[in-house]
Design a protein with these regions (language model features):
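Nucleotide-activated sugar donor-binding and catalytic core shared by glycosyltransferases
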Residues: 1-200, 204-282
Length: 282
């Protein structure tokens, strides 16, 4: 059996696809990774990139191009697994046309348009949050896939990052694309002089460091970020929530207020289980 993994866009879709692929490789199951519409830099390993457009009139030419680009890969697969978002459309449409077995993964508590549209063609929709299952007749709750990241002592992680401080370390992460709002919180906390702030600022920020702060656009090894931090302030994308739970870190979630408000529902899921505190941006 050969499994084709279709993902792309942002880290919220790519990270669970990589976790799934890691497990397939551990079990020696043949697989291929297709990524489309990449908006972020991500250590994805070997993969094939294809054209993907958003689900509107202007995106149709890119979708059509992506269908042609992914035809052979889909044709050679037995099963196609899509990880949500518009980038999965070209390979999943190919899978429908080629009568392949289709499975989908929904990363948010409030499902997006892509999975809602494609779910009737899928055998199952695997949901990261229980709340999402009620939107699909074939939905099943599976939790959040997280890569097997190394967990090391705080002192060791700080040494690798060349951080020397006796202050509490506040880790701030705004998702794979970064967050200007959370970057502002990072700068404010630095100004108090009461904390060392380790922030993943994404493409909206710059690499910089000082006596009580270190701002990094991107971490190749995100485990160093979590292992160095005493507490986390984060957006509420699925990947961040999964990693916070994996590293067992106390956290304050400030969900991204746009994109249909799906991060609010993600954050509520963890908050209701006592896994984090939550504040709305306003």
């Amino acid at each position: 059996m050969r499994i084709l993994i279709a993902s792309g866009g942002t880290g919220g879709h790519i990270a669970p696809a990589l976790a799934f692929r890691e497990e397939l490789r551990r079990r020696n199951i043949p697989n291929e990774l297709l990524l489309g519409g990449l908006k972020v830099r991500f250590p994805a390993g070997d993969h094939f990139e294809f054209s993907a457009g958003e689900l509107n009139l202007s995106g149709i030419p890119k979708i059509v191009k992506g269908i042609f680009q992914t035809f052979d890969a889909v044709n050679n697969a037995d099963v196609v697994v899509g990880f949500g978002g518009y980038p999965q459309f070209p390979p999943i449409l190919n899978a429908i046309l080629n009568n392949k077995s289709i499975y989908l993964f929904e990363p948010d508590a409030l499902p997006g348009k892509s999975n809602k549209f494609l779910s009737p063609f899928a055998q199952r929709v695997f949901c990261a949050f229980r709340e999402a299952t009620k939107y699909f007749k074939n939905g099943i709750f599976v939790g959040i896939p997280v890569r097997k990241l190394p967990i090391i002592k705080k002192e060791e992680a700080m040494k690798i990052l060349k951080i020397e401080t006796s202050l509490p370390v506040v880790g701030i992460i705004g998702g794979s694309q970064g967050s200007e709002f959370l970057n502002g919180i990072a700068r404010f906390l630095v100004s108090t002089g009461k904390f060392f702030v380790l922030a993943v600022v994404g493409k909206r920020g710059e690499n910089e460091e000082g006596k009580n702060y270190k701002f990094v656009k991107f971490f190749e090894d995100i485990s160093l970020f979590y292992c160095s931090s005493d507490v986390i302030i984060s957006r509420a994308g699925m990947s961040s929530i999964g990693e916070i739970a994996y590293f067992k870190k106390p956290a304050l979630l400030i969900p991204y207020p746009y994109a249909g408000g799906h991060q609010v529902f993600n954050a509520l899921d963890l908050y209701n289980f006592g896994g984090a505190e939550m504040l709305l941006e306003n």
